[in-house]
């Protein structure tokens, strides 16, 4: 369901980004097609989302490095990796692009090998490894262990894993020939989701039962409990734990690197639109908005809270906060696209003139909006139904919602902003 939702969201974003490529992406679209305060709140929410994600990834890096160096304090590793991410982004956009290419290559090769080994095991090709068939899907409470509550609870984490797909829209403002390249990138999203997410999860479900004692350890710092590691070890790869640890580290650096790029560009665009202090609009000779980069790096330093509260606790806080912010951003994409298409047609626009058209409109954005709402509001409803209300749990899960509403409504009240009517929308592709 999350994969299908993300696919519809990316086709929605692709339609707008190919027609109107801007660095502000869906935040600019929110201002143009919904209401100025809505775009303002989306922009700050998205900057905060990725800035916090950087901190979350740096905490994850601490957990990964503890596998090799358990005696070294985690904050040292966070400082080192924060410096690496900063260095890759401060040079130029090319530095970000080159590093992401190699990070992505490592992940792609690993997932392809994982799927290949998994399928070979499923079909009984791997020598000495017995195929469980479909038994793991039929045993006990499988495949829907925990029922609806568990599905909603895990949806936020699944959504966190998909976050970053919307970077296509952010990069559109700096890409060459976006009217041609954005549609190509969007069309590849379906196959990437199918192969790298759905197929990999299918392989894990087929080969590793939910009752596996390794999965119940609940130790985030133990790489041996990773489903990827378990599968490789059972296929006879003795060094699987160390290898997967290195791959996961590269994935963490990739996610943090992307977060640094996205949040910096978002803050820069907010400054250009007058929605953030003007000092964040200044760029270096190589085109890097360094003041925005400095501010983002400062928020990323939240990872150092682990020295006071513990790495696993801080990681959970940051993961919940970032996950909720990501779903708010996706809600903004769905709303903006629905209104863009309506406004575009209301002003006499022709679908044939769009460089890319989202499939199954209006079902796509409406489905994505509805599912986002269910997951966002129902994420931690169990905190309300127990004998005592878990106020700390509620705060950790939902803090992003009141912050978003406060920013939106505060801006709306101060600027006297109003919703944009379909006939008044700026749908000009050249006014970017």
Where would I find each of the regions flagged by the language model?
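Non-transmembrane, juxtamembrane loop and terminal tail segments
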Residues: 419-432
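Hydrophobic transmembrane alpha-helices that form the core helical bundles
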Residues: 6-90, 95, 249-252, 256-266, ...
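C-terminal membrane-solvent junction of multi-pass transporters and transport-like membrane proteins
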Residues: 102-103, 280-287, 330-396, 426
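Transmembrane helix-loop boundary segments of multi-pass membrane transporters
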Residues: 1, 60-75, 94-104, 243-247, ...
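Helix-loop-helix connectors at the membrane interface of multi-pass transporters/channels
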Residues: 27-37, 58-78, 110, 169-179, ...
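Membrane-interface loop-to-helix entry segments
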Residues: 75-132, 163, 186-194, 319-332, ...
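TM-loop-TM module centered on a large, flexible mid-protein loop between adjacent transmembrane helices
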Residues: 28, 35, 67, 154, ...
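Helix-loop-helix junctions that connect adjacent transmembrane segments
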Residues: 72-73, 105-242
């Amino acid at each position: 369901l999350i994969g299908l939702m993300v696919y519809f969201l990316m086709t929605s974003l692709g339609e707008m980004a190919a027609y109107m490529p801007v660095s502000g992406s869906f935040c600019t679209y929110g201002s143009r097609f919904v209401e100025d305060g809505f775009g303002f709140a989306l922009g700050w929410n998205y900057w905060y989302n990725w800035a916090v994600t950087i901190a979350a990834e740096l905490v994850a890096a601490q957990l990964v490095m503890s596998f090799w160096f358990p005696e070294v304090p985690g904050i040292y590793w966070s400082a080192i990796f924060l410096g690496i991410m900063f260095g890759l982004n401060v040079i130029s956009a090319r530095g970000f692009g080159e590093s992401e290419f190699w990070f992505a290559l490592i992940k792609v090769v690993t997932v392809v090998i994982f799927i290949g080994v998994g399928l070979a095991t499923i079909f009984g090709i791997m020598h000495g490894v017995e195929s469980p068939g479909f038994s793991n899907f039929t045993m006990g409470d499988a495949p829907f262990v925990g029922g609806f509550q568990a599905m909603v609870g895990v949806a936020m984490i699944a959504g966190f894993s998909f976050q970053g797909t919307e970077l296509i829209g952010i990069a559109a403002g700096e890409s060459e020939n976006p009217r041609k390249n954005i549609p190509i990138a969007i069309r590849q999203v379906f196959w990437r989701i199918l192969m790298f997410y759905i197929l990999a999860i299918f392989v894990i479900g087929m080969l590793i039962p939910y009752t596996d004692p390794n999965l119940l350890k609940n130790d985030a710092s133990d790489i041996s409990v990773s489903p990827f590691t378990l599968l490789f070890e059972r296929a006879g790869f003795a060094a699987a734990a160390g290898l997967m640890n290195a791959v996961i580290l590269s994935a963490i650096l990739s996610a943090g690197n992307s977060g640094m790029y996205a949040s910096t560009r978002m803050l820069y665009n907010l400054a250009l639109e007058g929605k953030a202090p003007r000092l964040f609009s200044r760029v270096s000779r190589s085109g890097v908005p360094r003041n925005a980069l400095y501010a983002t790096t400062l928020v990323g330093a939240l990872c150092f809270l682990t020295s006071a509260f513990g790495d696993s606790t801080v990681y959970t806080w940051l993961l919940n906060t970032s996950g909720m912010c990501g779903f708010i951003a996706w809600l903004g994409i769905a709303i903006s696209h629905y209104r863009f298409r309506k406004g575009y047609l209301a002003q006499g626009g022709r679908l044939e003139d769009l460089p890319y058209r989202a499939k199954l409109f209006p079902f796509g954005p409406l489905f994505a909006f509805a599912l986002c709402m269910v997951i966002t509001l129902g994420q931690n409803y169990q905190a309300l139904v127990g004998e005592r209300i878990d106020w700390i749990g509620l705060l950790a899960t939902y803090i992003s919602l009141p912050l978003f509403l406060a920013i939106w409504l505060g801006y709306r009240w101060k600027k006297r902003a109003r919703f944009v009517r379909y006939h008044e929308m700026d749908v000009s592709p050249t006014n970017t």
